[in-house]
Design a protein with these regions (language model features):
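Non-catalytic, topology-defining segments of multipass membrane proteins
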Residues: 1-138, 142-151, 169-227
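Solvent-exposed interhelical
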Residues: 163
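Active-site/pore-lining binding-face segments in mid-to-C-terminal subdomains
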Residues: 154-155
Length: 227
């Protein structure tokens, strides 16, 4: 999908606001069956190289995969048919993929989030680190305590980025301090008041970026009044 205005547009992106919701469900399945193994073999995550694990770290990876597939597929096969096991594995992984994708897409791939361009060296963003987090990250449904519990406070993505070592149970209180501080210094604090508002913004952003001529400005609304 085309998630950033910096990405080239392809013809199939015209319908990404429809088909990406289905592909989100494949995310976890791809990790389980392909992505992790590919990364280990090629020594890259995306286009970035990393030091491949060896010794004990490699053993942990292999053992972890064996344990996972034993619990996810092997054990159920002792009691159910192959078709039933594959069906429910696919459904479970698809639900996990959609939920995982939505949580992080609503934090970064919405109308209000900025997509800064690196400097001339292509490696460094000119904006200070904390400001960069605030401009590229959007909270959602901060007052929804049930949702906050269900996703472990990840609806407070701004606070998650700024204070990764603080327990998520403190994010509601921290967010009020961050919002007040942003207002004091004239820095935008980006949020959607509800979960539905975040979903809608993500949908509109996908649709806009898929159009032949994407003219959408990076920020379409006042983040302090967005609902």
């Amino acid at each position: 999908g085309r998630l950033s205005p910096l990405q080239p547009r392809r013809s199939w992106h015209r319908w990404q606001h429809i088909y990406l919701w289905v592909l989100y469900g494949v995310t976890v399945i791809r990790w389980h069956l392909y992505g992790d193994f590919r990364d280990m073999i090629t020594g890259t995550i995306g286009e970035r190289p990393f030091t491949r694990p060896r010794g004990w770290d490699l053993a942990v990876f292999v053992i972890g995969k064996l344990v996972f597939f034993s619990l996810a597929l092997g054990l159920p096969l002792l009691f159910h048919s192959i078709g039933a096991v594959l069906l429910f594995y696919t459904l479970t992984a698809a639900v996990a993929g959609v939920l995982l994708a939505l949580v992080f897409q609503m934090a970064h791939v919405v109308e209000e989030a900025d997509f800064p361009v690196p400097g001339e060296d292509g490696l460094q963003i000119d904006t200070p680190w904390a400001i960069h987090q605030l401009e590229t990250t959007v909270d959602f449904a901060r007052d929804n305590r049930a949702l906050s519990w269900f996703i472990g406070g990840l609806n407070f993505q701004v606070e998650h980025h700024l204070f990764p070592r603080i327990s998520h149970v403190h994010y509601p209180a921290v967010s009020r301090v961050v919002e007040d501080t942003c207002r004091e210094f004239g820095v935008p604090y980006l949020e959607h008041r509800t979960f539905a508002a975040g979903i809608a913004s993500h949908y509109r952003w996908l649709r806009e970026l898929g159009r032949p001529v994407a003219t959408t400005p990076i920020c379409l609304t006042d983040p302090l009044t967005q609902s």
